Amino acid sequence: MEKLLKIDRRIIFIFVALAVTIHLLFRFKMSVPPTRHVISMYDKIDSLSKDSHVLISFDYDPSSKEELQPMARALLHHCFSKDLKVIGMTLYPAGTGLAENAIKEIGKEYGKRSGIDYVFLGFKAGSSLVILNMGEDIYTAFQEDFYGKKTAGMPALKGVNSLRDIDYAVNLTAGGIYEAWIVYGKEKYNFDLGVGCTAVMGPEMYPFIQTKQLTGFLGGLKGAAEYETLVGHKDRAAAGMAPQSVVHVLVVCFILFGNFIYFATGRKK
C-alpha cells in the first residue's frame, strides 16, 4: 500500500498524456450548455441592429491565448454574421498580433474589409488614460488605425465620436484591466460592457454582475465553448473541452485514490 503513495511522477505524466490524446484517437462530442452570464452577453450582441458598433479590446498576451483567443474568434463570428461594425484595439503590447490575426482571419471568412466593415486601432500605451481619451474623442485618442490610415472619415467609424456612441463593448482580459474599463469607461460614459476572462478570474466577475456594471462574462475555455454553441459555430473551444474534461476527471481520480491509500495505510499504523 505504501508503495502506491510513492508512484514515480513520470507515470502520472504518462496518464495525463494519454488522457489528452484519447480525444484525438477516439473523438467524442461533449454537450456544453450555456450559462446565464454567457447567454446575457450573446443576447445583448444578438439584439443589435445592422451596422451597430461593437468595441472589442484584446487585452491579453500569448500566455493566455488558449483561453481568450477562442472567445475572440466566437465573438467576431457573431458580430460579422450580423453585419455589425467591429472596432478592435488592445491595451497590451503583446496582444497586437493576436488581435490582428483574429480580426483579419474571421473578417475574411465573411468578406469584411478593413476601414469599411471593421477597424483595428492597434495598441496604445496608457490604459486608463486611453479609455478616458476615447470617452471624449476617439479620433484624438487614435488619429490613425494600425495600418497608418486616418480614422477620421472611416466608414467603419461612421456615427462614432466617442465611447458614448458605442453600442456594446467587450474587454477580453487576462489581468485587472477590466476594472479600468468599468470605472473609467462604462461608469463615466454609460455604455454596456461585457468581459471575457481566464477561468481563474471568473469568480471576480460576480460582484460586477450583481451591481449590473457588467451585462455578462465568458469564463475560460468553457465560456468560449458555450458562446460557440450559441453562435452555432463550434471551433477551437468546443474541440478543447473534451480533452480538458478528461484530464480534470483523471486528476480528481488521482486525488481520491491518493486520499484512499493515505487513510488506508494510516489505519494500519
Predicted regions and their residues:
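Hydrophobic membrane-insertion alpha-helices, especially the h-region
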Residues: 10-26
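N-terminal positive-inside, membrane-proximal cytosolic segments immediately preceding the first
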Residues: 1-7
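Alpha-helical transmembrane signal-anchor/signal-peptide segments
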Residues: 30-50
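Structural recognition of alpha->loop->beta junctions
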Residues: 101-128, 211-229
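Membrane-embedded segments
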Residues: 63-119
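Acidic/histidine-rich, surface-exposed loop or edge segments in extracytoplasmic proteins
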Residues: 52-61
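C-terminal functional extensions of proteins
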Residues: 3, 196-269
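Membrane-proximal low-complexity regions enriched in glycine and acidic/polar residues
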Residues: 115-203
